[in-house]
């Protein structure tokens, strides 16, 4: 799976971005078809860059690209560092609130609902993420919301992810409002920011598979499949939005709050780009 990556960095990404940013000319437009075309181009970019990697394997991140790293990761997953977090998340999910209900009262299918999130709520005109839904359930039942980046929110999310493994990603974008949120997420993915003037795409498309010091830069395709993650760097489990904030800080950009509209729209776009892959969280990462 190792290979030397040679490419025209800027040109390839610019052509892809241009192809993916066409906007509907009128209201009677098939927004889902526009998005599906984006997905095809986006996934095609990575399949071309890494011809030895199957589409479904991109959910494993950098471990789909490098054989030695994958072997080490597989060994670590035999005794996953997030195992206790999943057990704690299960207990929290089933723990009664003061009113006698629980988080389990808010979610169907016994809580195996990871494949339903994120989605665009047409009544509220906003993206709803799993962590947002968890905290809204607590507040609706008279409980305080969890802190949004780590701790109990990540544990409950990890439990839900664990019992939802194998659910296929199939995020729909059917309305203009949903498409607008999708476009906001796409703009954030490609926009340069911070002291280093870097973008999400700059690292995770143009430089994906390359080494940054001792680490391999992960491909953007499949980014959202495996969260929450237990990162060795953190020494604990954390949410996708915690990772977003860390990326912003790394390039000298002020991070947005976890569960902000900006990060929810970005998660929406990134998850759409992984349509067809399967949710496989929680996971361990360096």
Curated annotation (Swiss-Prot):
One of its GO terms (molecular function) is heme binding. Binds 1 heme group per subunit. Its EC number is 2.8.5.2. It is found in: Periplasm. Gene3D superfamilies: Cytochrome c-like domain (1.10.760.10). Its cofactor is heme. C-type monoheme cytochrome, which is part of the SoxAX cytochrome complex involved in sulfur oxidation. The SoxAX complex catalyzes the formation of a heterodisulfide bond between the conserved cysteine residue on a sulfur carrier SoxYZ complex subunit SoxY and thiosulfate or other inorganic sulfur substrates. This leads to the liberation of two electrons, which may be transferred from the SoxAX complex to another cytochrome c and which then may be used for reductive CO(2) fixation. This is L-cysteine S-thiosulfotransferase subunit SoxA.
